[in-house]
Amino acid sequence: LSVQVHPTDAYAQEHENGQLGKTEMWYVLDAGREAKLVYGLKQNCTKAEMRRAIADGTVMKYLQKVPIHKDDLFFIQAGTVHAIGAGAMVAEIQENSNLTYRLYDYDRVGKDGKKRELHIDKALDVANLKGSAEPKQPLRVLKYRQGVASELLTRCKYFEVYRMIVNTERRQKVHYRADEIAFRVLLCVNGCGTISYEDGNIP
């Protein structure tokens, strides 16, 4: 994944024809022994310093690399510079937006032999260029009910994420209801199961 940043809602509405910005969360599904991600900067820098680092290929000296493990969580607020490294697989839960500003792409070229477009001016407009502390895992709230553990992973104004841990020793049902206010996305990250709904089943 390229080194990138997403705008806030306010910036996107003003500069991107009324679109939404993007705040997101990563849940690590799998990670190799050396897997890392980029989360913010390890030291303060100015826009001019970052621009020079992008131009001369030394931008990585400013980026904070964080070792990751299976089941880690990272809440990535709009404006946070970030990237996924090799050996990592994450589930990305995000605000309903596709706005991404690429800050650096490791000088890679596409199938056409050309480097991918960067969005340096807009990226520097929205990026938080202050040094970041190592990201803390969000507080997890765990509740038990009838053989199912419900774990609140993240709650913000854009989305809520829960992990359901089901007792596999017996067939267990977990009920969800979708309505006109919000929808639900179900992702099986371990084991197997069946989604049942009014018109049928999905294994």
Regions found by a protein language model. Give the residues of each.
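Active-site region of the double-stranded beta-helix
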Residues: 1-70, 85-192, 196-202
